[in-house]
A protein has these predicted regions:
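General structural feature for long, well-ordered alpha-helical segments within catalytic domains
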Residues: 39, 65-68, 115, 166, ...
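Active-site segments that bind and position negatively charged phosphate/pyrophosphate groups
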Residues: 191-223
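Acidic-aromatic/histidine active-site loop/patch
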Residues: 93
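A glycine/threonine-rich phosphate-anchoring loop and its flanking beta-alpha core
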Residues: 101-196
């Protein structure tokens, strides 16, 4: 399945458009306890969200496990999800990884949309179709490759992040800059992390995602 990445300027209209292309009888939103508080209020104001079922799991990567996965399956089941339902994964890489795996396995697969809320998830985790959970003390030990229908990147969510989370994503962008153009690298190293310009960062995120997409195209299953 081809994944479409949208650099958002009008999140509500872009989400409405994406949902119109995702067959769904019911809509679900997966958050963790952090994004439920910091990010979900933005979506709750959208008309297209008025009947959405919200499923919330504990935050942090330590909860990217079978217990949280079962919580999502249970939430989908109790909410009456069918094979024709759709789930939005709203959060960082933990949410997009686990949510993608849950959606890919529930009813043998339902549509899902990723709306990453961390810089690292925007330029890496949410793009490329890798989904999964930690198991037996090992990271990402169980999972599948399955693309979300859409990835919607809205850099406004980055206002909710602390410096450590911004730096984590920026480090991944630097890796992309090293294997891309000199111009991209120079813009990255001169970017002011202390006073980030969100419009400039939005463009840089788009450039970084293009590098990630080229990597995935060359080796989609990390052979």
């Amino acid at each position: 399945m081809e994944q479409r990445v949208i650099i958002s300027t009008q999140l509500e209209s872009e989400l409405v458009s994406a949902l119109s292309e995702c067959e769904h009888d019911k809509l679900f939103v997966l958050t963790d306890t952090t994004t439920l508080e910091l990010c979900m209020p933005v979506l709750q104001n959208f008309y297209c969200m008025k009947e959405a079922h919200i499923i919330t799991i504990p935050a942090t990567d330590s909860h990217k496990d079978i217990d949280s996965l079962m919580m999502v399956w249970k939430g989908l089941q109790e909410g009456g999800a069918s094979r024709h339902s759709c789930m939005i994964n709203l959060g960082g890489g933990m949410v997009t990884d686990l949510g993608g795996f849950a959606a890919s396995t529930f009813k043998r697969g339902i549509n899902f949309i990723n709306i990453p809320t961390t810089l690292l998830a925007m330029v890496d985790a949410s793009v490329g179709g890798k989904t999964g959970i930690n198991f037996g003390g090992l990271k990402n030990e169980v999972g599948v490759f399955n693309d979300s229908k859409f990835v919607i990147l809205d850099t406004e969510f980055l206002k909710t992040l602390d410096a450590e989370n911004i730096c984590s994503g920026y480090a991944e962008m630097l890796k992309h800059g090293l294997i891309s153009t000199e111009a991209m690298w120079e813009e990255l190293v001169s970017f002011d992390l202390d006073k980030p310009d969100l419009k400039q960062l939005q463009r840089m995120v788009g450039d970084s995602v293009k590098v990630k997409e080229r990597i995935v195209e060359q080796d989609p299953h990390e052979q």
